[in-house]
Amino acid sequence: MRATVPTNILPLDHLVLRGADDAPALVLREAVISFKDLRTRVSRLAGWLMAQVPEPGARVASWVAKGELACVMPLAAARAGLVHVPVNPLLKRAQVAHILADSGASLLLATPARLGSLEPGDVPGGCTLLAESDALFQAEALASECVPSSADPDALAAILYTSGSTGLPKGVMLSHANMWLGAESVASYLGLEADDRVLAVLPLSFDYGQNQVLSAWYAGASVVPLDYLTPRDVVKSIERHAITTLAAVPPLWVQLAELEWPDSASKSLRRLTNSGGALTTDLVHRLRALFPGARLFAMYGLTEAFRSTFLDPALIDSNPTSMGKAIPHAEILVVHDSGELAGDDEEGELVHCGPLVAQGYWQDAERTAERFRPAPAGSAYGGIAVWSGDRVRRDSQGQLYFVGRRDAMIKSAGNRISPQEIEEAALATGLVAEAVAFGMPDKR
């Protein structure tokens, strides 16, 4: 039976229309922004962006702290008919220079300190630089509002940069449909409700982090963005805001599990989500003991297809190392090297099919052809699939388990790291004659 793609897909900026007018949408240090106010801010920032960058489809980058602009920019750029390029705040100037040049960004909004770190030659010609606070002030002063977008769901909405096994970061192209359906899918299987409060501690520059915001707004829930210095800051924010939903990666979960939690903080949590690396059996047990009233979602995903699987929280105690099954709007196949579908408990490559599959790598036809290939003959969706390079197996109950990777990518703190990029950086110092980078196991 052929699977069908949903037809009720809207442009990404329509997410701000889903919450009640007076419901809190964004909780900042200095203010609580309702959905009604959020709609105005998205509209005005979009109007300002159109005045600054009138060319439809132009790329606009943000390299900012986790505040109003970081949260609003994905929707405002989409409404303005532009393509948002969020830059990880942890990246250094050379990496940012590559992203600006590769994406052909027409505008970079950043903190003054980050703008000051750029050197001559880092910014391509035709790219305007502006401090994020100035952008917000000018958008408010201009007060040029932009109506909700009528963009084609297949139109490009964002480019997210992720490390590759062969050097510099590559840009993953995401459409309005990719991001809308990703938000709908996660809100659905997590069971998010309008009274939920999501603490956004992960970087908004990659899919797992950005979806914290988008899936919450799909459900009409509120988001509390947090740039934390220590794990204790996370606990304090959860207690202060009565947070119900926390998404993290294994290294942060390890740190959080080592802390003493006030009852008021741990009891408000309804759900915990993990991606970016596998949870150990010991860590699962510790989290379940620390948060007995919260459902723990173990998940697997890749930027090229957003999210692939999640494990039913009811099975986490008996299957702590499982990746679970496909999320809504995804089809996950296990494929032999021969191209045939693998049987139960047979190892193969994880292949993700369906409407969450990205549009390829920005201006990189060669690497796109390597990773984005026709779906196997047994696919219910057909079309183009993501061949992940990850080796997995599926048991007789349909649960998936991670086995390993084909390439040399290193996974650290939830980030995919290119060993070649590290080696080239070491050689560029002139202090070493040869360099090799590889990952070391860490039981934590």
Question: Where does each model-flagged region fall?
Answer:
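ANL superfamily adenylate-forming
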Residues: A113-D154, L259
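Gly/Ser/Thr-rich phosphate-binding loop
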Residues: I243-A248, A257-N319, E331, S338
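AMP-binding/adenylate-forming catalytic core of the ANL superfamily
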Residues: L91, L246, G354, Q359-G360, ...
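Conserved AMP-binding/adenylate-forming
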Residues: A31, A46-A94, V201-P203, R416
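Conserved AMP-binding A3 loop
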Residues: S34-K36, A157-L181
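Conserved pre-ATP/AMP-binding loop-to-beta segment of ANL
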Residues: A143-Y161, L168, G191-R197
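Conserved AMP-binding/adenylation subdomain of ANL enzymes
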Residues: W180-R197, L204-T245
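Conserved ATP/PPi-binding loop(s) of AMP-dependent carboxylate-activating enzymes
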Residues: K325-H329, E340-P376, N415-I417
